[in-house]
Amino acid sequence: FNQLVIIKNEEFIFNKIDIPSTTSNDKSTETVSEITGIAIPSMFELQIKNKLSIHETLINVMFEKILTTETVSQPIKPIKKKHNINKIDINLLTPEQLLYICNCWNAHKNGFLFKVYQITNYNWLTQDTLDKCIVRMTNLNITNESAFEYLVDIQDEKELLNRWLIGYIDCFDKNNNIIYEFKCVNELTKEHYLQLAFYMYIYENKKKTDTVMSYVLFNILTNEYYTVSCDPEKL
């Protein structure tokens, strides 16, 4: 962490939007900040590109079928199931449906299905709050050529010790040469900066041009914007 150069963009004034970080039912309480952090950029993608990449992928991998298939490791069944990926019309997308899609996407990425099974109330993000967050995203001037949930990976590097690293960049603005990591948290931590450094390491080692990239950590809830850089030899 100490190798990172972190610069705050003072043009973005701290201004907090309150969004619950948990959701509950009569069985459990689950943290949802990560889901919210996927949902807002995804809605922004839908607005500027008229597509929802994660929805398309979930349909292609038949995620709903995965949810209803018994496995030895995850034999849990959903408590209640109001939504279905295959039946959601993204042209009429509600915040509740958006959050369900993003919960499924998060499960698809990390391989853990328990939050899809356990979360039944997708009511923590109102349309009004979502709209306010989208305004903040718009202020970033992200172009419509950008890629969202952009898959990157790397292997065969000496320091990886035969490991294969895989991650999803929140947003890759190819026109502006900016890679974004978005958060929806009350306070940024070292881990958030290190996550962006992780993507920096992968991308800088894999890129085939001399293009200078900017790496930005943006906390949607607080409107905090930080540019992160590092000597490539120290990543």
Specify the residue positions occupied by each region the protein language model found.
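Metal-dependent nuclease catalytic cores that hydrolyze phosphodiester bonds in DNA/RNA
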Residues: 1-168
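Glycine-centered tight beta-turn/hairpin loop motif at sheet-sheet or coil-to-beta transitions
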Residues: 164-166, 175-177, 223
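A generic structural signal for short coil/turn motifs at secondary-structure boundaries
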Residues: 187-190, 226-228
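Metal-dependent nuclease catalytic cores in nucleic-acid-processing enzymes
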Residues: 191-221
